[in-house]
Amino acid sequence: MPINKFSARSLDNDVPNKPLIFVMEGRYQNWIKPIMLLECLEIDYDAACIDGPTTRTDWFTRLHPQRYVPAMIDVEDGQRVSSWDSSQMLQYLSNKYDAKRMWNGHNAAENLEICNWLTFETASLGPTAKYWVWYALRQGEEQNPKAQQKMYNDLRVQYSILDKHLAQPGQNWVGLKDRPTIADLAIYPFADDPTMARMGIDKKDFPSLKAWSEALSKVPGVAKAYAELDSRKEIAIGA
């Protein structure tokens, strides 16, 4: 029986028949990653757009101890499985659903390089962008211009690292030279036009990064995930 995404009891206990991704209106940079991959692979999935109070419920806390989105429920050998890290979701989903390994490596060396850049996003670019936004939203005495400037400078360093990497001969994509992978999907939401514009960073300063971003934005699954951003509306979840 399919999971009922409008029932907290079902979401807490039942086994889905396809991946279910929890998302939230507004900041999309993490939760859009698994959705881009699922769209690129043309895998059927469901999404539940939840509000802030829902993330603090007992059932969601059991699913995601840090109470963030994305979180994911899926089925594996008839058993309910879950994940609550966007990079881990990319690895899990590509390993399970990408039989042709279009978005993953074809050997150990390729997988290692892809994981290098997944880690770059998880440990560097993503957290830096997150805390830049946190400081940018502070008001009055909570403002810390020095800390915010530090985050901004660090972001420019990280974009510079990406730009230099992509400027190497034949390096059309982040993880591998010849094709986009889950590493590109992990990094793109923190280097798309709206995000960099919000941070006051001109993409013209990073021409290779700009060219890569424009190319990835035209990948059909990526374009579809972004086109549907505004359609993700909060749902009411009952008992």
UniProtKB/Swiss-Prot annotation:
Protein family: Belongs to the GST superfamily.
Species name: Clonostachys rogersoniana
Lineage: Eukaryota, Fungi, Dikarya, Ascomycota, Pezizomycotina
Upregulating conditions: Expression is regulated by the cluster-specific regulator verZ.
MF terms (GO), sorted A to Z: glutathione transferase activity
Cross-referenced SUPFAM superfamilies: GST C-terminal domain-like (SSF47616), Thioredoxin-like (SSF52833)
Any Pfam family hit: GST_C
Keywords associated with the record: Transferase
Pathway: Mycotoxin biosynthesis
The GST C-terminal domain, residue ranges: 107-237
Superkingdom classification of source: Eukaryota
Function per UniProt: Glutathione S-transferase; part of the gene cluster that mediates the biosynthesis of 11'-deoxyverticillin A, one of the dimeric epipolythiodioxopiperazines (ETPs) from the verticillin family that act as mycotoxins. 11'-deoxyverticillin A is required for normal conidiation. The nonribosomal peptide synthetase verP is speculated to be responsible for condensation of amino acids to form the carbon skeleton of verticillin, whereas the cluster-specific tailoring enzymes are involved in further modifications leading to the production of 11'-deoxyverticillin A.
Reaction equations catalysed: RX + glutathione = an S-substituted glutathione + a halide anion + H(+)
Protein name per Swiss-Prot or TrEMBL: Glutathione S-transferase verG
EC number in record: 2.5.1.18
UniProt domain GST N-terminal: residue ranges: 18-101
Gene for this chain: verG
Phenotype seen when the gene is deleted: Completely abolishes the 11'-deoxyverticillin A production.
Entry-linked InterPro entries: Glutathione-S-Trfase_C-like, Glutathione-S-Trfase_C_sf, Glutathione_S-Trfase, Glutathione_S-Trfase_N, GST_C, Thioredoxin-like_sf
